[in-house]
Amino acid sequence: MESLYRVPFTVLECPNLKLKKPSWLHMPSAMTVYAMVVVSYFLITGGIIYDVIVEPPSVGSMTDEHGHQRPVAFLAYRVNGQYIMEGLASSFLFTMGGLGFIILDRSNTPNIPKLNRFLLLFIGFVCVLLSFFMARVFMRMKLPGYLMG
């Protein structure tokens, strides 16, 4: 494999560049990187790529038995399609569940007061459980009859 990498460099010669980092460029803090990761996770799980390509409506409408148009947030019976609000709501739940796990992890740090540890555990469990059960409710709205036992 080394010999294959060596073949192009028998003909090409790498330039001798002396690059230095610009003075205004600094290493971002850990919380800045974490915030960028959470925001990108929110956008990707929300289906931002799908929303840009397909351009679905933000909410849909359904005609009830009296002939009136009712707004609906979930595109029922379609696994491969979504409204924008549906994607954002689901993405919020996934992000809330992920943050709940991170909060649960932070409750294990040493030297944390007992009340703060209890509050972190409570908030973490609430975030994880609420996100899990709301995702199940969303699945029932998306696919009626699914997960019914």
UniProtKB/Swiss-Prot annotation:
GO CC term, one of those recorded: oligosaccharyltransferase complex
Annotated metabolic or biological route of this protein: Protein modification; protein glycosylation
Cytoplasmic side: 1-32, 105-117
Record GO biological process: protein glycosylation
Topology relative to the membrane: Multi-pass membrane protein
Family annotation (Pfam families): OST3_OST6
Extracellular domain ranges by topology: 54-83, 139-149
Claim: Metal-binding is one of the keywords in the record: no
UniProtKB keywords: Membrane, Transmembrane, Transmembrane helix
Principal subcellular localization: membrane
Transmembrane feature ranges: 33-53, 84-104, 118-138
Subcellular location(s) of the protein: Membrane
Summary of subunit composition and partner proteins: Specific component of the STT3A-containing form of the oligosaccharyltransferase (OST) complex.
Function summary: Specific component of the STT3A-containing form of the oligosaccharyl transferase (OST) complex that catalyzes the initial transfer of a defined glycan (Glc(3)Man(9)GlcNAc(2) in eukaryotes) from the lipid carrier dolichol-pyrophosphate to an asparagine residue within an Asn-X-Ser/Thr consensus motif in nascent polypeptide chains, the first step in protein N-glycosylation. N-glycosylation occurs cotranslationally and the complex associates with the Sec61 complex at the channel-forming translocon complex that mediates protein translocation across the endoplasmic reticulum (ER).
Family stated for the protein in its record: Belongs to the OSTC family.
Protein's UniProt name: Oligosaccharyltransferase complex subunit ostc-A
Native species: Xenopus laevis
